[in-house]
Every structure is written in C-alpha cells, then in structure tokens.
Amino acid sequence: MLDWHCTWRNRADELSDSLKNTMLLGHYMVTRYRGHYYAKAQNLVRRLRRAYDDVLARYDLLLMPTLPMVATPLPEPNAPVEQILQRAFEMLANTAQFDCTHHPAMSLPCGLVDGLPVGMMLVGKAFDENTILRAAAAFEKGVDWKSLKAG
C-alpha cells in the first residue's frame, strides 16, 4: 500500500481537484514557512482535542449535524475548478476537526429536506468506536429516517 501512495506524483491526474489543492497548499506552506504554521496548527489541535475530551468526559457521545447546510446539487462535470473547490471545502466545517483530533465519528441519515438526505454525526471518545456504533444501530433499528421531515 505504501508503494502505491509513494507514486502519487506519477498519477496526479487521478487525484481530485480538492485533494490536489490541499496538497499544493501544504507543500507551499512547508516550503515557504519551514513548518512554522504546521507546528502552530499541531499545538491548536492538541488544545482542540483536550476541549472535546473535556466535553466527552461528561457525555457518552456528541450529536451534531454532519454538514453546516442542507444538501446542494453537485457541480456539473464541466464546472469551473473554483466552484468544485468551494463545494468540496464548504462541507468540511463540522467534520474536519475530527480528522485532526482522531475522535471517532460517523454520519447517519436522519431525515429529508427537499427530497435529499440530512445527516447527523455521532462523535465518541477517543478509541470508543463501539459507543457510536451501538447508538447508530439503535437509531437505525428504531427510526424510519426517510419519514422524518425538517421543520
């Protein structure tokens, strides 16, 4: 698997525009600022992880919307790269922090708005995937999410 990842430069055309943008930005920041902002970001991630750990010490899990907005149509295949990137990054506001803090999180459909699914995200304590899996299974067993409407 590592060999496959090491050859990404030979297959850059297979990567999404949002991934290429993120990789280029990361490369620029490390090259230009020699890791200064990466180190600062890591310090902020530690503070963020502690803040979530403090909340999760009082609660079994957190429940929040997966996206900060209702679903929007996907950009057309020939849409400008700017539109594709905007759509990709606008969806990360509620999820990206858990990629950094490593808290287990999962999204479940919990209703419909204009015929499109709305997601709820369950976030658990570090290394406690079992709690969110049990909660998700209970929700899926007990609720017909397609019948739920916003309002």
Specify the residue positions occupied by each region the protein language model found.
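Structural helix-boundary/capping segments
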Residues: 1, 19-50, 58, 99-151
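Glycine-rich phosphate/pyrophosphate-binding loop
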Residues: 1-18
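Short, positively charged
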Residues: 14-17, 87-91, 144-147
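Short glycine-rich anion-binding loops that position phosphate/pyrophosphate groups of nucleotides
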Residues: 29, 67-70
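Short, surface-exposed loop/helix-turn segments at secondary-structure junctions
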Residues: 36, 40, 44, 71-92
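Catalytic machinery of carbohydrate-active enzymes
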Residues: 55
